[in-house]
Swiss-Prot record:
Species per Swiss-Prot/TrEMBL record: Amborella trichopoda
Binding site for ATP: 174-181
Cross-referenced Pfam families: ATP-synt_ab, ATP-synt_ab_N, ATP-synt_VA_C
Protein name, per record: ATP synthase subunit beta, chloroplastic
Compartments where found: Plastid, Chloroplast thylakoid membrane
Primary enzyme class: translocase
GO molecular function, one term: proton-transporting ATP synthase activity, rotational mechanism
Domain of life: Eukaryota
Protein's job: Produces ATP from ADP in the presence of a proton gradient across the membrane. The catalytic sites are hosted primarily by the beta subunits.
Family matches, as InterPro entries: AAA+_ATPase, ATP-synt_VA_C, ATP_synth_F1_bsu, ATPase_a/bsu_AS, ATPase_alpha/beta_chains, ATPase_F1/V1/A1_a/bsu_N, ATPase_F1/V1/A1_a/bsu_N_sf, ATPase_F1/V1/A1_a/bsu_nucl-bd
Gene name of the encoded protein: atpB
Quaternary structure (record): F-type ATPases have 2 components, CF(1) - the catalytic core - and CF(0) - the membrane proton channel. CF(1) has five subunits: alpha(3), beta(3), gamma(1), delta(1), epsilon(1). CF(0) has four main subunits: a(1), b(1), b'(1) and c(9-12).
EC number: 7.1.2.2
Keyword Oxidoreductase: no
A GO biological process held by the record: proton motive force-driven mitochondrial ATP synthesis
Length: 500
């Protein structure tokens, strides 16, 4: 991390540029530039180079590149972070003498940045003098926090069945329209309220429209506070689909660098979203091919595991704070053995799978209770009571799933008394796994609910014990804790009597 001195006047800026080594463009192949430097003035790997000048039409050009290879004969091969249109051989290239650095700290909250850490939301410059290089080593072993603790989200289905690890990595699997964005926003909202933490969202190879939609929805739901931007709970970093592979490959590191500052300096719990981690791999594959490396399995880069590891190993808990990461994972052609998802799986502590079937039933969050998994769901970590309750909930739902074919063909009357009871309880559990969200208040009109882990366990234990068998299943739909479900049942009974 670096505190930048404030520079005043143009003289100081000119003198610093004079001290930098200057090279010239020798070759341009798409986003890859070869630059020749004077002998003894070669930049280091990962140094940031800047091309400034005018194109043939007289337009100002400002392109930042990153050194990837030292070719010999005083030439380096670099990858551009923005479009190379208008660049020509012979143009001057300035070596900044350091890796790409981006602004960090509270001033980044509520703002949108590109890979270079430049604000792109038309709200003026970012008021920060503190910057940090995007290439850093992972925390040393001595700094790591080895304690296994659950990261409580206040979302019943997650906390009970696939709990998140504090400082862990979670894979979020979901197609379009199943509530991924709303779940992301609720997690951002809840971490700010319950943990006093902040969030960083890294849009890696995103559709520009989706990034814009997310920003608008965050403003609407209050996650980004337009009136007082400092009150916002999230910083956004976008490297969109239309940008060169260099930008898409590095935007995840820009977001991670901002998150690391909140963890290490502010000692906060940070939530880091990466959407989509598979596009980070894809961008790395493109860059690898452009640099002339021999491809590995299925055409991926030979350095796939190293690149993934260098990003993932920085996402961890230290004695100061934690970075808990939620990463959307795209599975090419639904093939889980593809190198990209297979390499990602090796780093994940939990998976949250969103189901289209549950979304179609109107059960939100549409988290699949049987497909979602977590390494934290062990008796020695979560305790016997939590573990037993979660296992019984899964068994009940699994039995209901097995009986659905019989119900569809023969009807519920053909089931045994025991199975009928299981189905009734499973339907209550399924509905009780739904929950009203704070960020969805604007659309639904019903206030959001944060449910603590102890309350969640108590609620499911009561359903499983049969104490609530007499209550109608709609009483369990979109409520917070179990007391709200019993109160809703009384209200439903009163309403039905009034109708009669």
């Amino acid at each position: 991390m670096r505190i930048n001195p404030t520079t005043s006047g143009s003289g100081s800026g000119a003198s610093t540029l004079a001290e930098k080594s200057v090279g010239r463009i020798a070759q341009i192949i798409g986003p890859v530039l070869d630059v020749a430097f004077p002998p003894g003035k070669m930049p280091n790997i990962y140094n940031s180079l800047v091309v400034k000048g005018r194109d043939t039409a007289g337009q100002q050009i400002n392109v930042t590149c990153e050194v990837q290879q030292l070719l010999g004969n005083n030439r380096v091969r670099t990858v551009a972070m923005s479009a190379t249109d208008g660049l020509m051989r012979g143009m001057e290239v300035i070596d900044t003498g350091a890796p790409l650095s981006v602004p960090v700290g509270e001033a980044t909250l509520g703002r949108i940045f590109n890979v270079l850490g430049e604000p792109v939301d038309n709200l003026g410059p970012v008021d920060t003098r503190t910057t940090s290089p995007i290439h850093r080593s992972a925390p040393a072993f001595i700094q790591l926090d080895t304690k296994l603790s659950i990261f409580e989200t206040g979302i019943k289905v997650v906390d009970l069945l696939a709990p998140y690890r504090r400082g862990g990595k979670i894979g979020l699997f979901g197609g379009a329209g199943v509530g991924k964005t709303v779940l992301i926003m609720e997690l951002i909202n809840n971490i700010a309220k319950a943990h006093g933490g902040v969030s960083v969202f890294g849009g890696v190879g995103e559709r520009t429209r989706e990034g814009n939609d997310l920003y608008m929805e965050m403003k609407e739901s209050g996650v980004i506070n337009e009136q007082n931007i400092a009150e916002s709970k999230v910083a956004l970093v976008y490297g969109q689909m239309n940008e060169p592979p260099g930008a898409r490959m590095r935007v995840g590191l820009t977001a991670l660098t901002m998150a690391e500052y909140f963890r290490d300096v502010n000692e906060q719990d940070v939530l880091l979203f990466i959407d989509n981690i598979s596009r980070f791999v894809q961008a790395g594959s493109e860059v690898s091919a452009l640099l002339g490396r021999m491809p590995s399995a299925v055409g991926y880069q030979p350095t796939l595991s190293t690149e993934m590891g260098s990003l993932q190993e920085r996402i961890t808990s230290t004695k100061e704070g934690s970075i808990t990461s939620i990463q959307a994972v795209y599975v090419p052609a639904d093939d889980l053995t593809d190198p990209a998802p297979a390499t990602t799986f090796a780093h994940l502590d939990a998976t949250t799978v969103l189901s289209r079937g549950l979304a179609a039933k109107g059960i939100y969050p549409a988290v699949d209770p049987l497909d979602s998994t977590s390494t934290m769901l062990q008796p020695r970590i979560v305790g016997e009571e939590h573990y037993e309750t979660a296992q019984r909930v899964k068994q009940t739902l699994q039995r209901y799933k097995e009986l659905q074919d019989i119900i569809a063909i023969l009807g519920p009357d053909e089931l045994s008394e025991e199975d009928r009871l299981t189905v009734a309880r499973a339907r209550k559990i399924e509905r009780f796994l739904s929950q009203p969200f704070f960020v969805a208040e604007v659309f639904t009109g019903s206030p959001g609910k944060y449910v603590g882990l102890a309350e969640t366990i108590r609620g499911f234990q009561l359903i499983l014990s049969g104490e609530l068998d007499g209550l109608p299943e709609q009483a369990f739909y979109l409520v917070g804790n179990i007391d709200e479900a019993t109160a809703k049942a009384i209200n439903l009974e009163v309403e039905s009597k009034l109708k009669k």
